[in-house]
Amino acid sequence: MYSMLDTDMKSPVQQSNALSGGPGTPGGKGNTSTPDQDRVKRPMNAFMVWSRGQRRKMAQENPKMHNSEISKRLGADWKLLSDSEKRPFIDEAKRLRAVHMKDYPDYKYRPRRKTKTLLKKDKYSLPGNLLAPGINPVSGGVGQRIDTYPHMNGWTNGAYSLMQEQLGYGQHPAMNSSQMQQIQHRYDMGGLQYSPMMSSAQTYMNAAASTYSMSPAYNQQSSTVMSLASMGSVVKSEPSSPPPAITSHTQRACLGDLRDMISMYLPPGGDAGDHSSLQNSRLHSVHQHYQSAGGPGVNGTVPLTHI
């Protein structure tokens, strides 16, 4: 065992002396023309000194074993050795390092760096050249990500994508004014179709506002208009036309009802002769109000002559 260890220790020393050009060799350090000395190798460490003979022996025993598998097994065997067994190889590695520093004082370790430009180019390319030759792969990937999640951008009915497409068309230099007008008419916000629930709710709010603004005598007409509008909004909501103008007869009737209601709650004014006529007008207005607002059940139940 010790004889094999001595031969393993002597062989790297002789090789290092041959490479560095020892003091007895005529080649010396000045011989730099050979291709072996163009690149200076690092000095061997303790594991490399020990694994030289072990690697050769294991390769002879297992000729089909790969070099990486041999290195794994040698590393596991090196860890199992004790410090006393590693000591001679550590001392030999220190001696080789001292000789290397003496022969090459200006030596600096420069590891070989792999170029990563090809990896960056292949990172953004699709398999099979699916993209067109004039399309940037990075911009195409960003557009695909935006189109993949249209429901998370907060825009309903695809309005965000429509706006982006309209902006893209607007920036095109070869587009004339007629095409731009067609695009603007196509993406007009007034022509967008809303859902039936939204349109019916909007019609209900508009009808409620018109109900409060009109007199109670015309509630039936407004409810009919509201129902017809809600039925029409289920099919398609069109731009609503302005409401018809109130005629003079309707305005006069509303003003008359308003005067009757005000005069009923105000104290009687003027002389005593006007009191009876004012009271009769009050009774007539109250009777007419209940007759128009109530149903047929209210008209014949409570007589108003006892007031």
Curated annotation (Swiss-Prot):
Record localization: Nucleus; Cytoplasm
Gene Ontology CC terms, in alphabetical order: cytoplasm; nucleus
Keyword check for Transcription: yes
DNA-binding region coordinates: 40-108
UniProt entry keywords in alphabetical sequence: Cytoplasm, Developmental protein, DNA-binding, Gastrulation, Nucleus, Repressor, Transcription, Transcription regulation
Record flagged with keyword Calcium: no
Renumbered residue ranges of the record's region Disordered: 1-43
Domain of life per record: Eukaryota
GO molecular function: beta-catenin binding; DNA-binding transcription activator activity, RNA polymerase II-specific; RNA polymerase II cis-regulatory region sequence-specific DNA binding; sequence-specific DNA binding
Residue ranges with Gly residues bias: 21-30
CDD domains in the record: HMG-box_SoxB
InterPro entries attached to this UniProt entry: HMG_box_dom, HMG_box_dom_sf, SOX_fam, SRY-related_HMG-box_TF-like
Motif (9aaTAD): 257-268
GO biological process: brain development; formation of primary germ layer; negative regulation of DNA-templated transcription; negative regulation of transcription by RNA polymerase II; neuron differentiation; positive regulation of transcription by RNA polymerase II
Its job: Transcription factor with sequence-specific DNA binding activity. Binds to the consensus sequence 5'-[AT][AT]CAA[AT]G-3', showing a preference for 5'-AACAAT-3' and 5'-AACAAAG-3'. Inhibits beta-catenin-mediated dorsal axis specification by binding to sites within the promoter of the beta-catenin-regulated gene nodal5. Acts maternally as a transcriptional repressor of nodal5 and nodal6 to restrict their expression to the vegetal hemisphere of early embryos and thus establish germ layer formation.
Domain notes: The 9aaTAD motif is a transactivation domain present in a large number of yeast and animal transcription factors.
Known partners and oligomeric status: Interacts with ctnnb1.
Protein name per UniProt: Transcription factor Sox-3-B
Naturally occurring in which organism (per UniProt): Xenopus laevis (African clawed frog)
